[in-house]
A protein has these predicted regions:
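An N-terminal, globular interaction/scaffold subdomain
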Residues: 62-66, 70-76, 80-145, 153, ...
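Redox- and metal-dependent alpha/beta enzyme cores, enriched for Fe-S-associated oxidoreductases
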Residues: 75-76, 87-88, 93-122, 307-373, ...
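C-terminal hydrophobic structural anchor segments
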Residues: 368-414
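A charged, amphipathic alpha-helical module
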Residues: 2-81, 206-344
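Structural motif
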Residues: 84-88, 157-161, 311-316, 388-390
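Short, well-structured alpha-helical segments in soluble
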Residues: 139-150, 372-380
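Cap/lid and interdomain-hinge subdomains that line or gate substrate/regulatory clefts
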Residues: 172-258, 437-464
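Peripheral docking tails and interdomain loops at the edges
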Residues: 2-14, 400-465
Length: 465
């Protein structure tokens, strides 16, 4: 069988399987296909003008989701090449080659929002997935076993931050009989403010850049899609524009403007792990977000002077009382997952630029480095809440070290042992007591001591253009 015949066979198999999987997904929700099509059309017929940033983002993600099932926004059938990607795998090369990313962890979060996650996790646990495994992965594994997700053309995974993601991709690769590509990321390349070891950084950048070139060949081999440099340059330009607006919004809301938004909702953007980098529409989403911040600061009544919190990690996506309770008594003024830690990328040197952004992620370095980096830019009087799932080995295991570093820096710190997806161990009454004590301590401090001024290190580390 020729390569062209193999690709045609995959397309034919995927087309049939995705039709069944879409019906399975709708059945889970208790929705008929005709009703679903009517809803999809009505949602996407509305002009983007006048939509909020959150609505634009939601519509973009919904459109990407249905396209993975070969559905267009007007509900016609069109085959879409799909790459399952792990949460921290860059997406620009995929968009440049007309490959739609499908992020299983994001789908797991959506299951939790709908209250459909427990059954998926139980399915996974009944099939030998351990209960102490990441709940995002368990939910996704259950969905795979129940045949709810769209069959991929390929799977692409990175090795950093999420330890079980490559193992899960290997499981899915065997299940669907589709090829997997693993991007190997060296650990601990980001060195903090001074970044002394230039040689080590450049070697890591070159190592990962060569793998991105291999990824292009992998995609062409298994999908038949040819690579065009000019298309990747355009995608990189869109990522740079989106970066500018996201970063500008972050800085305005934290240092200059009154936080008029619900910070718990802003965590939903989860920009530095999102699959929308490289799309034209995400530029408009982040621009609109910034404009909403500015407009809100100019027109809204000042909020009561409440303690301000920087949020570490993600949040519970299931229905919960925690986030609303915190925001009754404090402001979530910033968060880890929206931080923009990288420089503008060079569209004329795309592989090295993507590699540099990937290896220089502060979250994938020694705990002491990323914690001390946080101490350089936080406003005096603000505190940190770290919501760490016990199943997330990478972050949960770091809380003791972080606590000691932040205590030395006089930054109040609270680590909450929770879970983003699995609510079976949720105990709000216990957590509430700890939150009350923490916020009471923040109120005793002098809040807002440096508000409106950026510490000098922000210019050195976060404001590099």
């Amino acid at each position: 069988m020729t390569r062209e015949d193999q690709i045609a066979r995959v397309i034919d198999e995927n087309t049939g399987q995705r039709a069944v999987q879409f019906k399975n997904f709708l059945s889970l929700l208790g929705i008929g296909e005709e009703a679903a099509n009517d809803y999809i059309r009505s949602r996407h017929d509305r002009p983007a003008t006048g939509l909020s940033a959150s609505q634009k983002r939601g519509r973009l993600l919904a459109e990407q989701f249905i396209r993975c099932y070969n559905k267009t926004p007007d509900c016609t059938e069109r085959y879409q090449r799909v790459a399952w990607r792990s949460l921290f795998m860059p997406t620009e090369i995929m968009y440049a080659m007309d490959i739609m990313p499908f992020t299983t962890e994001m789908a797991a979060a959506q299951f939790a929002r709908m209250g459909r996650q427990i059954e998926r996790m139980e399915t996974a646990e009944e099939n030998h997935f351990s209960q102490d495994l990441c709940s995002f992965i368990r939910t996704a594994a259950g969905a795979v076993i129940e045949d709810l997700f769209p069959t991929p053309d390929i799977l692409v995974t990175s090795s950093h931050l999420c330890d079980p993601s490559a193992k899960f991709a290997g499981f899915a690769s065997i299940k669907y009989k589709r090829p997997e590509f693993v991007l190997d990321i060296p650990y601990g390349i980001y060195g903090g403010v001074y970044e002394h070891d230039v040689t080590r950084i450049e070697e890591a950048v070159e190592y990962v850049a060569e793998q991105f070139k291999d990824l292009v060949g992998f995609i062409t081999l298994h999908t038949g899609v040819e690579f065009h440099e000019e298309r990747l340059r355009q995608v990189m330009e869109w990522s740079n524009q989106a970066r500018k607006w996201m970063k500008t919004g972050n800085e305005f809301s934290y240092y200059e403007g009154t936080p008029v938004f619900r910070g718990s909702k802003d965590i939903d953007y989860a920009a530095n792990l999102m699959q929308t980098w490289g799309t034209e529409k995400i530029v408009d989403v982040y621009r609109t977000r910034y404009e909403e911040f500015v407009r809100g600061a100019e027109t809204s009544e000042p909020l009561p002077d409440r303690p301000r919190i920087h949020w570490y990690h993600l949040k519970p996506y299931y229905k919960n009382n925690l986030m609303g309770y915190i925001e009754e008594h404090a402001v979530i003024a910033s968060n880890m997952v929206n931080s923009i830690y990288w420089d503008d990328m060079d569209p004329d040197d795309p592989f090295r630029s993507l590699a540099r952004r990937t290896v220089m992620m502060p979250g994938y370095c020694p705990v002491s480095v990323r914690a001390k980096l946080t101490t350089q830019w936080m406003v005096e009087g603000d505190g940190i809440i770290a919501f760490y799932p016990k199943s997330c080995r990478h972050f949960h295991s770091s809380s003791r070290i972080e606590s000691e570093i932040f205590k030395e820096a006089n930054i109040p710190y609270l680590a909450i042992d929770g879970d983003c997806i699995d609510n079976r161990g949720d105990d709000f009454a216990v957590v509430k007591t700890r939150v009350d004590r923490f916020i009471k301590g923040l109120k005793r401090m002098k809040t807002g001591a440096g508000r409106g001024r950026q510490p000098k290190y922000v210019q050195q580390v976060f404001d590099r253009k």
